[in-house]
UniProtKB/Swiss-Prot annotation:
GO CC terms: cytoplasm; cytosol
Catalytic activity: 5,6-dihydrouracil + NADP(+) = uracil + NADPH + H(+); 5,6-dihydrothymine + NADP(+) = thymine + NADPH + H(+)
Pathway: Amino-acid biosynthesis; beta-alanine biosynthesis
Residues given in the record as NADP(+) binding sites: 340-343, 364-365, 371, 437-439, 481-487
Organism: Rattus norvegicus (Rat)
GO biological process: beta-alanine biosynthetic process; circadian rhythm; CMP catabolic process; dCMP catabolic process; dUMP catabolic process; purine nucleobase catabolic process; pyrimidine nucleobase catabolic process; response to glucocorticoid
An example Gene Ontology molecular-function term: flavin adenine dinucleotide binding
Residues the record lists as binding substrate: N609, N668, L669, S670, N736, T737
Functional summary from the UniProt entry: Involved in pyrimidine base degradation. Catalyzes the reduction of uracil and thymine. Also involved the degradation of the chemotherapeutic drug 5-fluorouracil.
Needed cofactors: FAD; FMN; [4Fe-4S] cluster
Protein name: Dihydropyrimidine dehydrogenase [NADP(+)]
EC number assigned by the record: 1.3.1.2
Length: 1025
C-alpha cells in the first residue's frame, strides 16, 4: 500500500505530462519539424510575412509605449531617479520626471499626475504623442546600460489616465485669496484665439494664477486644435483631449466655438475696444502648403492634403468630437503618401483604417534623413506600409477624371552634400489616392489683416520675443505653430506656459503691481490637496505622520534641517550618548541586501548595517536641537538617546535632551550590534525588567513624552512594550532592525568585511524585507495595549505601506531605508499619496478600487483585449495560428461595428464628489486590528478556488508548475494552446496567484461546492508502525 500511495495516480501523471524534468540527454528533432514548431509558438510577426493585417475601421491604441499597471510598476522601479536628471532637462515643459516616476513606483498615481499636470496641463496628451526618443528618453542615463532607457511617455500616460478615471476636478490654488478678494488686475479680460494645445496651456496657467475672465475663441465647432483634428484616434483619443479641456474649464475658463480672429468677425482692434487687456494668438497654421503639381486636383479625383484628410478621419473615428455623424473617407486601392514627417506617417496609417489596400510612403531623401521620430516610422513599418526613398514628385497622372498614378524623378546627394534631382531617372507608380502632407502656412488675408498692427517675419509669421512670446504689440502674445518655433505638441504647450507668465507680468504692470523676477507659476491642485493629514500623539501635533528615523538620514542636524524644509513632519536625532560612551564607527558598514537579487541601484528591498550610534557629542546634538526648534516650531523633533543600565546616566542624559528643547525623547533600547557588547542598546532592551526600570528613571527625570525603541530580536515583543508602559513610557517605537548576516562570498569571507582580517559581525537588517516583522510587532502591541501610542518603523517606503502601519495601530511613521534608496524629496510623494488614499475612501463610485489602483481590465501589453470567446465561442491564446485567427476575428468584428461606436453627442465629464466623510488619520489608526485573530477563529467553511482570465494569460505555465511541485496538481496545461485550466480539485492555496507574472490574471473566487480535504487514507485506517 505504501508504494501505491507514494506514486502519482494515472490521472495525475497525465496532468504532469508538461511539467519540467531534468534533461538526461541531448534533444534531437528535425530542422523541418522545428520550423513548424516555431510557427506554432511565434508571438511576433514572421519576418517572411507579407500579408497586410486588415485594419479597416480599427482605431484601437497601437502605441508601443502604452502600459498597464504591472508594466508601469516594473518600469518605474527600473528608473534610477537620477540627481539633476537629464530627462527633465530635455523635456520642453520641464516636468519633474524623476519625482513622478518615483510616485508611480510607490503606487501613488495621483501624486504622479499632480506633478505632471503642474508643469504641463496637457500631460496626458503629451504622454501619448510626445516624441520622447528625441526628448526626455534621449537623455536617459540608462541608455548607457544593456536594458536601455525608461519608457517615460508610457509612464506619463499611465499615471494621468488613472487620474482621469478618478474624475476629480481641478481647483484654484488654496494659496490664493477667494476670488472676491483678489486685486482688480485679476479681473482683467483676456482673450485667446484657437483652442489648441498652446491656448489651453496658456489659459490653464492664467486661471491658476487667479485670473477670472479668460475666454478662448475657436473657429471650429470642436475644441483641441490639431490634437483633435489631425492626430489619429489610435494615437490620441478624443476623450483625452476633452478631459484636459474640462480640467481647464474647472477653473472658469470659457470657450466660444464658431468664432475666430478675422476681419469678418473679430480683430485685435475690436478686441481692444471691447476692453480686453491681453490677447494670445494660438491659431496654428490653418492652410495647407500645396505644390503646383496638385493645382486643380480634388478629393473626388483622389487627392487630399493632410489638412483635408486627417480631419475627415478624425470626424469619422472620434466619438464625441462632432454633434453630427461623419463617415470615414473612403480610401480604396493603392495610396501614395508624400513625405516622411510625423504627419505623413499619421496619414499613411490612417489610410489603412479607411480601407486602403496598400500604402506607399514616398520621400525625397534617404532613411537616414527621415524627419519623423522612430516611434512613428516603426508603427508604419509594422503595418506593412511600403517605403520608397529618393523620389521627388513631378506630376500626377489622371485618367477619366480619377488619379491613376504619379511620376517621380530620382534624387541623389552629391559630394558637397546638396540634393539634386536626376530628370533622366523617372519612376512611375500606380495609385488611386494621393495624400500630400507638405506642411501648413498662414496666408488667409482676412486673418493677417485682423492681426494688424503686429509685425510679421520673413516667413509670414508673427514676430515674437522667444523668451516672453510677446509680439510687437505689448498686449498681444502668440505661441504654438503660428509662431514657427514649436515643432511638437509639447513645445506648443510650453509656448503657452511661457506666455502665461509674461501676460501676467504685463497685466500686473498695467495696474501698478510687480511680479517676482523669477517666474512662480502655481501648481495643479484638486480637493485631494486639501485633505488634512496631521495627527496628534502623546499630546504632540504632527503636521504629517512621516518622519526621519534615528538613523543615517539624521546623521547631522543640517540634514534634519533640509528634511524639514522638504516637508517631513518630524525627525529623530541620530542616537547620541554621554561623552564617556562616545563611539567610533568602522568601515565598510552599510551594504545592500541580497534579498533584492540582481537588482542594482535604487529600490533595494533591504540594507544591512553595522553602524553604531552617532559619533557626534551630546553637546552638538543639544545645541542643534535648540537651533532647529527655534526655526521649525511646528515640526516635532525627538532626541534619541542611549545609555547603559545606569540610573544616573539615563537621568543625566534625558534631562540634558529635555533642556535642549526637544519635543520628546526616544530611548534606544534595541541597537542589535556593537552597542550590546557595551551593555547598551539590545543588552537593555531584551529584558522586560531592565526596560521597565529605565523607563521609570527617565519618567522621574523629564516631563516631555518619551518612547522606548523596541527590538524585534526577542521572543515576545509585547512583554517588552508592556514593561515600557508600566515604566511610564508614553509609547514605543516598533521596531528596530533585525539582526542578521547578509551574505558570504565564494571564498567564504563575509560582506561587509572590515580590515585585512576580513572580519564582520551580525548587523541590523532594514528595509521592506523586514516589513512583515514590523507589521506583526505593531499589530501585536496595538491589540495587547489598546490606545498605547506606537511610532512605526521597518520597511515604510510609500504612502501605501505607511497606511498599512496606520491600519495596524501606529500613529506616526519613521523612515530610513527608503531615503537611503532615494533622497529627502520622497516626502512629497508620501504626503500626496496619503491624502489621495484618504480622499478616495470618500467616493462611492471608486469603492471597487484597491487604494489608487483601479480594477484590472482584461489586457495584453496594457491595452484592452476583446473577449474572443464571446465573439466566436472559443478560447484562443495570443500566439502562432491562434493569434492570426484572433486578428481575423477582430478585423471582421470592427468592420461589422462600422459606425456603431461613432457617438454623436458631445462628451460630458462627470465629477466624482465625496459622498462620505474623508477619514482623518485618527480614523484609520488600528482599522485592521478587527481582522486579526487566532487560526481557530478562521472560517473553514468559506473556501476559495482559482479563476484564470484566459485573455490576460501569457501561457507561461508558472501556475501549473507551482501547483504540481508545491501544491495539489489541480491545474491542467493544454499541450497545444498552453491555456491553463483549474480543476475542481483546487484547494484555494493561492500559490498560483502568488507566482503569476500578470497582475490579476488569476483571482481567488468563492468555491461553489463544499470543500472536502484529500486525507490520503480514510481517517479510520490505522498507521503502520
Amino acid at each position: 500500500m505504501a508504494g501505491v500511495l507514494s506514486r502519482d495516480a494515472p490521472d495525475i501523471e497525465s496532468i504532469l505530462a508538461l511539467n519540467p524534468r531534468i534533461q538526461a540527454h541531448a534533444t534531437l528533432r528535425s530542422t523541418m519539424a522545428k520550423k513548424l514548431d516555431k510557427k506554432h509558438w511565434k508571438r511576433n510577426t514572421d519576418k517572411n510575412c507579407f500579408i497586410c493585417e486588415k485594419l479597416e475601421n480599427n482605431f484601437d491604441d497601437i502605441k508601443h509605449t502604452t502600459l498597464g499597471e504591472r508594466g508601469a510598476l516594473r518600469e518605474a522601479v527600473r528608473c534610477l531617479k537620477c540627481a539633476d536628471a537629464p530627462c527633465q532637462k530635455s523635456c520642453p515643459t520641464s516636468l519633474d520626471i524623476k519625482s513622478f516616476i518615483t510616485s508611480i513606483a510607490n503606487k501613488n498615481y495621483y501624486g504622479a499626475a499632480k506633478l505632471i499636470f503642474s508643469d504641463n496641463p496637457l500631460g496626458l496628451t503629451c504622454g501619448m504623442v510626445c516624441p520622447t526618443s528625441d526628448l526626455c528618453v534621449g537623455g536617459c542615463n540608462l541608455h548607457a546600460t544593456e536594458e536601455g532607457p525608461i519608457n517615460i511617455g508610457g509612464l506619463q500616460q499611465f499615471a494621468t489616465e488613472v487620474f482621469k478615471a478618478m474624475n476629480i476636478p481641478q481647483i484654484r490654488s488654496p494659496l490664493l485669496p477667494p476670488p472676491e478678494h483678489m486685486p482688480e488686475a485679476y479681473s482683467a479680460k483676456i482673450a485667446l484665439f484657437g483652442a489648441g494645445p498652446a491656448s489651453i496651456s496658456c489659459a490653464s496657467f492664467l486661471a491658476r494664477l487667479g485670473y477670472s475672465d479668460i475666454t478662448i475663441f475657436e473657429k471650429q465647432e470642436y475644441v483641441g486644435g490639431l490634437s483633435t483634428s489631425e492626430i489619429p484616434q489610435f494615437r490620441l483619443p478624443y476623450d483625452v483631449v476633452n478631459f484636459e479641456i474640462e480640467l481647464m474649464k474647472d477653473l472658469g475658463v470659457k470657450i466660444i466655438c464658431g468664432k475666430s480672429i478675422s476681419t469678418d468677425e473679430m480683430t485685435l482692434s475690436t478686441l481692444k475696444e471691447n476692453g480686453y487687456k491681453a490677447a494670445f494668438i494660438g491659431i496654428g497654421l490653418p492652410e495647407p502648403k500645396k505644390d503646383h503639381i496638385f493645382q486643380g486636383l480634388t478629393q473626388v479625383q483622389g487627392f487630399y492634403t493632410s489638412k483635408d484628410f486627417l480631419p475627415l478621419v478624425a470626424k469619422g473615428s472620434k466619438p464625441g468630437m462632432c454633434a453630427c455623424h461623419s463617415p470615414l473617407p473612403s480610401v480604396r486601392g493603392a495610396v501614395i503618401v508624400l513625405g516622411a514627417g510625423d504627419t505623413a506617417f499619421d496619414c499613411a496609417t490612417s489610410a489603412l483604417r479607411c480601407g486602403a489596400r496598400r500604402v506607399f510612403i514616398v520621400f525625397r531623401k534617404g532613411f537616414a534623413n527621415i524627419r519623423a521620430v522612430p516611434e512613428e516610422m516603426e508603427l508604419a513599418k509594422e503595418e506593412k506600409c511600403e517605403f520608397l526613398p529618393f523620389l521627388s514628385p513631378r506630376k500626377v497622372i489622371v485618367k477619366d477624371g480619377k488619379i491613376v498614378g504619379m511620376q517621380f524623378v530620382r534624387t541623389e546627394q552629391d559630394e558637397t552634400g546638396n540634393w539634386v534631382e536626376d530628370e533622366e531617372q523617372i519612376v512611375r507608380l500606380k495609385a488611386d489616392v494621393v495624400i500630400s502632407p507638405f506642411g501648413s502656412v498662414l496666408d488667409d488675408p482676412k486673418v493677417i489683416e485682423a492681426l494688424s498692427p503686429i509685425k510679421f517675419n520673413r516667413w509670414g509669421l508673427p514676430e515674437v520675443n522667444p523668451e516672453t512670446m510677446q509680439t510687437s504689440e505689448p498686449w498681444v502674445f502668440a505661441g504654438g505653430d503660428v509662431v514657427g518655433m514649436a515643432n511638437t505638441t509639447v513645445e506648443s504647450v510650453n509656448d503657452g506656459k511661457q506666455a502665461s507668465w509674461y501676460i501676467h507680468e504685463y497685466i500686473q504692470a498695467q495696474y501698478g503691481a510687480l511680479v517676482p523676477s523669477q517666474p512662480t507659476l502655481p501648481l495643479f491642485y484638486t480637493p485631494v490637496d486639501l485633505v488634512d493629514i496631521s495627527v496628534e500623539m502623546a499630546g504632540l501635533r504632527f503636521p504629517n505622520p512621516f518622519g526621519l528615523a534615528s538613523a543615517t538620514p539624521a546623521t547631522s542636524t543640517p540634514m534634519i534641517r533640509r528634511a524639514f524644509e522638504a516637508g517631513w513632519g518630524f525627525a529623530l536625532t541620530k542616537t547620541f550618548s554621554l561623552d564617556k560612551d562616545i563611539v567610533t564607527n568602522v568601515s565598510p558598514r552599510i551594504i545592500r541586501g541580497t534579498t533584492s537579487g540582481p537588482l542594482y541601484g535604487p529600490g533595494q528591498s533591504s540594507f544591512l548595517n553595522i553602524e553604531l550610534i552617532s559619533e557626534k557629542t551630546a553637546a552638538y546634538w543639544c545645541h542643534s536641537v535648540t537651533e532647529l526648534k527655534a526655526d521649525f516650531p511646528d515640526n516635532i523633533l525627538i532626541a534619541s538617546i542611549m545609555c547603559s543600565y545606569n540610573k544616573n546616566d539615563w537621568m543625566e542624559l534625558s534631562k540634558m535632551a529635555e533642556a535642549s528643547g526637544a519635543d520628546a525623547l526616544e530611548l534606544n533600547l534595541s541597537c542589535p550590534h556593537g552597542m550590546g557588547e557595551r551593555g547598551m542598546g539590545l543588552a537593555c532592551g531584551q529584558d522586560p525588567e531592565l526596560v521597565r526600570n529605565i523607563c521609570r528613571w527617565v519618567r522621574q527625570s523629564v516631563r516631555v513624552p518619551f518612547f522606548a525603541k523596541l527590538t524585534p530580536n526577542v521572543t515576545d515583543i509585547v512583554s517588552i512594550a508592556r514593561a515600557a508602559k508600566e515604566g511610564g513610557a508614553d509609547g514605543v517605537t516598533a521596531t528596530n532592525t533585525v539582526s542578521g548576516l547578509m551574505g558570504l562570498k565564494a571564498d567564504g569571507s563575509p560582506w561587509p568585511s572590515v580590515g585585512s582580517g576580513k572580519r564582520t559581525t551580525y548587523g541590523g537588517v532594514s528595509g521592506t524585507t523586514i516589513r512583515p516583522i514590523a507589521l506583526r510587532a505593531v499589530t501585536a502591541i496595538a491589540r495587547a495595549l489598546p490606545g498605547f501610542p506606537i511610532l512605526a518603523t521597518g520597511g515604510i517606503d510609500s504612502a501605501e505601506s505607511g497606511l498599512q502601519f496606520l491600519h495596524s495601530g501606529a500613529s506616526v511613521l519613521q523612515v530610513c531605508s527608503a531615503i537611503q534608496n532615494q533622497d529627502f524629496t520622497v516626502i512629497e510623494d508620501y504626503c500626496t499619496g496619503l491624502k489621495a488614499l484618504l480622499y478616495l475612501k470618500s467616493i462611492e463610485e471608486l469603492s471597487d478600487w484597491d487604494g489608487q489602483s483601479p480594477p484590472t481590465m482584461s489586457h495584453q501589453k496594457g491595452k484592452p483585449v476583446p473577449h474572443i470567446a464571446e465573439l466566436m465561442g472559443q478560447k484562443l491564446p495570443s500566439f502562432g495560428p491562434y493569434l492570426e485567427r484572433r486578428k481575423k476575428i477582430l478585423a471582421a468584428s470592427k468592420i461589422r461595428e462600422n459606425d456603431q461606436n461613432r457617438a454623436c453627442s458631445p462628451l460630458q465629464r462627470k465629477h466624482f464628489n465625496s459622498q462620505k466623510p474623508i477619514p482623518a488619520i485618527k480614523d484609520v489608526i488600528g482599522k485592521s486590528l478587527q481582522y486579526l485573530g487566532t487560526f481557530g477563529e478562521l472560517n473553514i467553511m468559506e473556501q476559495v478556488v482559482a479563476l484564470i482570465d484566459e485573455e490576460m494569460c501569457i501561457n507561461c505555465g508558472k501556475c501549473y508548475m507551482t501547483c504540481n511541485d508545491s501544491g495539489y496538481q489541480a491545474i491542467q496545461f493544454d499541450p497545444e494552446t498552453h491555456l491553463p485550466t483549474v480543476s475542481d480539485t483546487c484547494t484555494g492555496c493561492t500559490l498560483c496567484l502568488s507566482v503569476c507574472p500578470i497582475m490579476d490574471c488569476i483571482r481567488m473566487v468563492s468555491r461553489a461546492t463544499p470543500y472536502e480535504p484529500k486525507r490520503g487514507l480514510p481517517l479510520a485506517v490505522k498507521p503502520v508502525c
